[in-house]
């Protein structure tokens, strides 16, 4: 197990809430679907007015099933470090092949492309909002 200051509080919980986003697409729309999902996550983070970065994972850091993955990290100023809050991946046909998930293409049936991601990991987002939007112990109201 891990121990230390970097794994306490809202950073490492045994259970945490998040919203998953999923798309099932054909090969032609797969890349666009990934971009739409990334744009959605970015719009959520931007609306919270917190610093973030989008990282394209290298092949060595990808999960076994993933073809391409983008991680989103938010900066927690109180901790002076970046916290991963979202990960969006395209698995192409890896998952659909295992569950025989097919879609119609003309008169044929072909394997679908599956994409998924966590919209936002709530504890880390809450921690970052609290650290970013405080002003002399009075929290700014986030409007919108």
Model-based region annotation:
Residues 1-144:
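TRNA-recognition modules of translation machinery and tRNA-sensing kinases, especially anticodon-binding
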């Amino acid at each position: 197990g891990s121990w230390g200051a970097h794994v306490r509080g809202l950073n490492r919980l045994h259970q945490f809430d998040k919203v998953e986003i999923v798309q099932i697409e054909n090969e032609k729309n797969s890349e666009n679907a990934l971009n739409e999902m990334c744009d959605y996550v970015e719009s959520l983070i931007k609306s919270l007015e917190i610093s973030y970065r989008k990282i394209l994972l290298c092949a060595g850091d990808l999960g076994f099933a993933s073809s391409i993955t983008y991680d989103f990290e938010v900066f927690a100023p109180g901790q002076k470090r970046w916290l991963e809050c979202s990960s969006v991946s395209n698995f192409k046909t890896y998952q659909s092949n295992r569950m025989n998930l097919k879609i119609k293409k003309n008169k044929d049936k072909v394997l679908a492309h599956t994409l998924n991601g966590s919209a936002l990991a709530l504890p880390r987002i809450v921690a970052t909002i609290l650290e970013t939007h405080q002003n002399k112990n009075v929290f700014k109201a986030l409007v919108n």
